[in-house]
Amino acid sequence: MILGFDPGRDKCGLAVMGKERQLLYHQVVVSQEALATIQQLCQDYAIETIVMGDQTTAKSWEQKLSRDLSVSVPIILVDERYSTLEARDRYWQMYPPQGLKRLIPQGMRQPPRPIDDIVAILLIERYLTLGSRGS
């Protein structure tokens, strides 16, 4: 099981995916709850790897996870450039607009909720794609 983690100052995206790319969990949590939530997810899903975005607050979160998690799990940093734009498109694939909202061009639509969890999904997918190229 792989945990995707999109760390942020105010909120964080989390996702859990199996190695066959089945999505088991995704959620946006406030940053203060992220560590406890990750701890719980590691127990609930037997997480083998944490995949995390490499921008903004990544280094401090990597240190915090390495220090404070009660389980030893490898942390892999993945390039997260353009992931927010990609996540916006993915949101509309996962939750197609209804009614008159369908008439608005996709590039002009804004998701009605934070999409950090979808970024976490994309980080896992990027990691798996890189891994499959390397084997």
Model-identified regions with their sequence ranges:
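Phosphate- and other anionic-substrate recognition elements at nucleic-acid/protein interfaces
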Residues: 1-5, 9-135
